[in-house]
Curated annotation (Swiss-Prot):
One of its GO terms (cellular component) is plasma membrane. The gene is med. It is a lipid-anchor. PANTHER family: ABC TRANSPORTER GUANOSINE-BINDING PROTEIN NUPN (PTHR34296:SF2), TRANSCRIPTIONAL ACTIVATOR PROTEIN MED (PTHR34296). This is Transcriptional activator protein med. Its main location: membrane. Residues 1-17 form the signal peptide. InterPro entries: BMP_lipoprotein, Peripla_BP_I, PnrA-like. Positive activator of the comK gene. It is found in: Cell membrane.
Length: 317
């Protein structure tokens, strides 16, 4: 059943728009599909935040559905939103790419938005987060703070560029560091992720990067109980414990969605693949723990500045 935004949100957002210039752009109504919940405090919550910001800025009706995973459910949701007048539809994840690319031409009056997947239809836009660089600097931080000379990565899938970046960054900071990498093969398998963490801990890892948005919170909570260190993922997770989360690799998908909405509203959006890196404000490093020394933080900041200018990550000579 379709979920309209809670009435109190609608009232507040409409009130905040009073006195503004009436809407005259291309956006009519906006929809968003979520494969899971909007309450995960990570990926889903970020997407929902973007939807709320779009509603507030453009004073338009917005709709969302959670738990939309199967091809049949996706197609039914598209048709439902189309009937409601939605002309900008976000599929919050790569799992929507196949269906959006397939049926996009059947809905020429709609613009479809996906993430981290190839856009193939003329009216499909894909938001890509260039994860290697953020992973690199997260890996540097992990290696710098490790006392056991062992760090770990619990990733969801082998294709995640931030994992390769993390390994390279850890090796750049400390060529002798050991990086233990494991995969859950699912974004949300917190049971498997916590078990993998326990194994890594027993093998000596004292800094772990849980690179999966559906399980990183429970893993970090366990890391905190054990008195070890974590690198946060997707959101700035310093609020989970500033003495636990050394820094975070942040993907501001909400900002990316707002950029796409603004371009669509102005009629300047070019479909296809849009890439966002550390120089865009969409991808960034999160708050550093006070345990991370200032000299290292300043060195990281200089390396990021150089990367933003050259597009090249540092290498050991």
């Amino acid at each position: 059943m379709i979920t309209r935004l809670v009435m109190i949100f609608s009232v507040l957002l409409l009130l905040s728009g009073c006195g503004q210039t009436p809407f005259k752009g291309k956006i009519e109504k906006v929809g968003m599909l979520f494969p899971d919940t909007i309450n995960d405090l990570v990926w889903g919550t970020k997407g929902y935040k973007g939807l709320l910001n779009i509603q507030s800025k453009y004073n338009v009706d917005v709709y969302y559905k959670e738990g939309v995973k199967t091809e049949e459910d996706i197609i039914n949701a598209i048709e439902d939103f189309h009937k409601r007048g939605v002309n900008l539809l976000y599929g919050h994840g790569s799992e929507y790419a196949e269906v959006f690319n397939l049926v996009g031409e059947d809905y020429p009056d709609m613009e479809f938005v996906i993430s981290n997947a190839k856009a193939k239809a003329d009216n499909v836009t894909s938001v890509h987060f260039s994860g290697e660089a953020m992973g690199f600097f997260g890996g540097m931080t992990a290696a710098h703070m490790s006392k056991t000379n062992q760090v770990g990565v619990i990733a969801s899938f082998t294709w995640q560029p931030e994992v390769d970046g993390f390994i390279k960054g850890a090796k750049y900071e400390n060529p002798d560091i050991e990086v233990n990498t494991k995969y859950t093969d699912h974004w949300d398998d917190d049971t498997t992720a916590v078990k993998l963490y326990q194994k890594m801990k027993n093998e000596g890892a004292d800094v772990v990067y849980p690179a999966g948005d559906g399980y990183n919170v429970p893993v970090i909570q366990q890391i905190k109980k054990d008195g070890l260190y974590a690198i946060g993922y997707v959101t700035d997770q310093s609020d989970l414990g500033e003495n636990t989360v050394l820094t975070s690799t942040v993907q501001n998908v909400d900002k990316a969605y707002e950029i796409i909405a603004e371009q669509f509203n102005k009629g300047t959006l070019e479909g296809g693949d849009h890439y966002y890196d550390l120089n865009t404000g969409v991808v960034e490093m999160g708050t550093f723990s006070p345990l991370v020394d200032q000299d290292f933080q300043q060195r990281i900041a200089k390396l990021i500045k150089t990367y933003n200018k050259t597009g090249e990550l540092p290498k050991n000579e």
